């Protein structure tokens, strides 16, 4: 999760575990690299889908705004102004596992639309 790179208000334990995953991946890359094994982490931002729609609906209800207004507010934190899709994540994973990614190891790769804050 991108929460391993940015702050996540009211979700400190979650964010802390995501920072830990980055350290784990970097350590695994050092340990396993001599055997030709690569380790990387994908850090998704806000992933489009039903789960995210429920989160947006709940936040909209609390703030007494429409779904669309809440969605736009959430997306305003990402410079690309769009959600990540499952396909985006799959394509990045495929690239990393392909011969094109053969020299990429120990990296925490954000797939997040340049989101500046989580939550």
Spans of model-derived segments:
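Residue(s) in the substrate-gating loop at a strand-loop-helix junction
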Residues: 1
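Short C-terminal tail/terminal secondary-structure segment
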Residues: 5-6, 93-94, 100, 105-119
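Active-site loop immediately N-terminal to the catalytic Tyr-X3-Lys motif
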Residues: 6-13, 34-35, 81, 99
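Active-site helix of classical SDR
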Residues: 17, 25
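Short, small/polar-rich loop/turn modules that mediate ligand/substrate recognition or access, typified
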Residues: 33, 38, 104-106
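Conserved SDR Rossmann-fold cofactor-binding beta-strand/turn motif
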Residues: 38-48, 97, 110-112
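Short, flexible catalytic-loop segment of classical short-chain dehydrogenase/reductase
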Residues: 43-54, 58, 62
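A conserved structural motif in NAD(P)-dependent oxidoreductases
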Residues: 66, 78-89
């Amino acid at each position: 999760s991108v929460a391993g790179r940015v702050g996540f208000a009211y979700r400190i334990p979650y964010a802390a575990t995501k920072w830990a995953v980055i350290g784990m991946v970097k350590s695994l890359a050092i340990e396993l690299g001599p055997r030709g094994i690569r380790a990387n982490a994908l850090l998704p931002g806000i992933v489009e889908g039903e789960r995210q729609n429920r989160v947006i609906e709940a936040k909209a209800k609390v703030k007494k705004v429409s779904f669309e207004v809440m969605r736009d507010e959430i997306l305003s934190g990402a410079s690309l102004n769009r959600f990540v899709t499952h396909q985006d994540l799959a394509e990045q994973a495929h690239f990393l596992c392909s011969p094109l990614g053969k020299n990429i190891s120990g990296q925490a790769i954000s797939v997040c639309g340049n989101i500046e804050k989580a939550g």
